[in-house]
């Protein structure tokens, strides 16, 4: 169960980061202030919820195990940027993602 909470905390944290990125995207039409406030508001909600879930995780897991699991954020952000904004991801970056996933698997099996 705590693994699900940890993944959800990670996804909400990433959601907050992606909302911040979206807030900075240029608009083709007016409404810049509304656009900015919407995405920054969503970012705050996501980040706040992530923090609450993170506190639940820290009550259960040792910080030495829990904190490295947040490396998943790098994986989620890379995948989202690639799919949502069609950002180029070089092979070296994909190798880093694979290494992060390997590290998470190794650390997760020790928990």
UniProtKB/Swiss-Prot annotation:
One of its GO terms (cellular component) is plasma membrane. It is found in: Cell inner membrane. GO terms for molecular function: carbohydrate derivative transmembrane transporter activity. InterPro entries: EamA_dom, Flippase_ArnE, Small_drug/metabolite_transptr. The chain crosses the membrane at residues 38-58, 61-81, 91-111. Pfam families: EamA. Pathway: Bacterial outer membrane biogenesis; lipopolysaccharide biosynthesis. GO terms for biological process: lipid A biosynthetic process; lipopolysaccharide biosynthetic process. Keywords: Cell inner membrane, Cell membrane, Lipid A biosynthesis, Lipid biosynthesis, Lipid metabolism, Lipopolysaccharide biosynthesis, Membrane, Transmembrane, Transmembrane helix, Transport. Residues 40-109 form the EamA domain. It is a multi-pass membrane protein. The keyword Lipid biosynthesis applies. Its main location: membrane. Belongs to the ArnE family. Translocates 4-amino-4-deoxy-L-arabinose-phosphoundecaprenol (alpha-L-Ara4N-phosphoundecaprenol) from the cytoplasmic to the periplasmic side of the inner membrane. Heterodimer of ArnE and ArnF. This is Probable 4-amino-4-deoxy-L-arabinose-phosphoundecaprenol flippase subunit ArnE. The gene is arnE.
